[in-house]
Amino acid sequence: MSQVNRRKVLFVTSELADLVKTGGLGDVSAALPRAMRHLHDVRVLIPGYPQVINSGNPIHIISQLGGHAALPPCKVGRMDMKDGLVIYVLICPELYEREGTPYADSNGRDWSDNHIRFARLGLAAAEFAAGEVKSQWCPELVHAHDWPAGLAPAYMRWRGQSTPSIFTVHNLAYQGTVSTASSRELGIPDSAITPEGMEFYGQLSFIKAGMAFASHITTVSATYAREITTPEFGCGLEGFLQSKANKGQLSGIPNGIDESWDAATDEHLICHFAPNEWTRKEINADYVRELFELDASTGPLFAVVSRLVYQKGLDLTIGVAEHIVNNGGQIAIIGRGEPEEEEAMRELAARFPGRVGVRIGFNETDARRMFAGSDFLLMPSRYEPCGLSQMYAQRFGSLPVARNTGGLADTIEDGVTGFLFNESTVESYTQALDRAFQVFAHPELLNAMRCRAMAAPFNWHQAVEPYADLYRDLLKKNVSVSSNY
């Protein structure tokens, strides 16, 4: 694309994998702007958490922004990453410089003022789009991600700005709800507190605000875009989303994964390997067994690399664990999450010493080695907007055993690159596992599936082109969805 056609796009996000992340949102927020930079000038706005401020990357203050309602004044700094990606940091120590995650303290308790913290992020994005940040760069389109950035399109609309916006739903279940009593401190107009606006069963919903006031809504897979218009997956917003879909304002664009996920070159692996070099893959398996204190074995090794939350269907994995062990399999589990889920994983490992191992926490190096060393990846998610682990696993020759939902349905070919099951039941899960055991017993079938999985085209090009088309269409119209605000 010629320089004259390059447009200025601001990503608004609460996570960026280079600096701070809790899940896939951080990965996407870091990878997609880089994948698009040959087409557009894409920059990122993120809060100034300690992990950002203390990252070792120089930050140059470029502007100051005043307060609004209960939202405090703040500064905007510019951080230039080594590869050229420009990050704008929203500096407000009273809101962001706290120990813990972007959303919770060190004990896992959500910050009580999250509505203030992320409303300030949304307002800063609107101020950026209005040219109020003293910078030579002003976005022509704002692309906001998930509920923490949900008020970015909303403030833009309430302030009468015509800059188009996109809101991407990464997980509809996390909605950012707060009492309607907070409307005054957030500067929300009464006219926005309606079923067509951000009102949600007597509360205010940040994610609904993003969807209500953005020019267009995207989700991270085509199947999930359809699913969220149904009661099973719509989280109470299915009617609202069906209305958006009917107007052509909802679409699904799949995530990709970056080129570092290559078994032949990944610097994290114990042993590199290529398709058909399965003895070299087994060296990674030996490492995983040692790390998780599993017995030496020639049976299949199943991996769980996951947030430990109800969504991920871990209770179903507990329900099939004995079946896996009785058939000669082993399970290695890594992740962190809800305390009760973490304890359930510890109890599972205690039930099957040497056959099931668990490490509470997350380490990307070990996660990569688990994908490389395992034969199968377990992903019995109740819903999965996109999912990245199943793509990582396939790149490393680990075949997913997963529920047929969301992005899993879009990225796993049943019986070709993995095994899908339809119902969130132990019975349905077990049937898929039995198919996996049957394939494992026939090395020629197993290796053929591994080769096909490793060749699957999970690059960012599949996302870049649809987003580029959407950006072009919105910028051409340069109008937002009709509204009275």
Curated annotation (Swiss-Prot):
<dbReference type="GO" id="GO:0005978">
    <property type="term" value="P:glycogen biosynthetic process"/>
</dbReference>
<comment type="similarity">
    <text>Belongs to the glycosyltransferase 1 family. Bacterial/plant glycogen synthase subfamily.</text>
</comment>
<comment type="pathway">
    <text>Glycan biosynthesis; glycogen biosynthesis.</text>
</comment>
<keyword id="KW-0320">Glycogen biosynthesis</keyword>
<keyword id="KW-0328">Glycosyltransferase</keyword>
<feature type="binding site">
    <location>
        <position position="21"/>
    </location>
    <ligand>
        <name>ADP-alpha-D-glucose</name>
    </ligand>
</feature>
<dbReference type="InterPro" id="IPR001296">
    <property type="entry name" value="Glyco_trans_1"/>
</dbReference>
<protein>
    <recommendedName>
        <fullName>Glycogen synthase</fullName>
        <ecNumber>2.4.1.21</ecNumber>
    </recommendedName>
</protein>
<comment type="function">
    <text>Synthesizes alpha-1,4-glucan chains using ADP-glucose.</text>
</comment>
<dbReference type="GO" id="GO:0009011">
    <property type="term" value="F:alpha-1,4-glucan glucosyltransferase (ADP-glucose donor) activity"/>
</dbReference>
<dbReference type="Pfam" id="PF08323">
    <property type="entry name" value="Glyco_transf_5"/>
</dbReference>
<dbReference type="Pfam" id="PF00534">
    <property type="entry name" value="Glycos_transf_1"/>
</dbReference>
<dbReference type="InterPro" id="IPR013534">
    <property type="entry name" value="Starch_synth_cat_dom"/>
</dbReference>
<keyword id="KW-0808">Transferase</keyword>
<dbReference type="InterPro" id="IPR011835">
    <property type="entry name" value="GS/SS"/>
</dbReference>
<dbReference type="GO" id="GO:0004373">
    <property type="term" value="F:alpha-1,4-glucan glucosyltransferase (UDP-glucose donor) activity"/>
</dbReference>
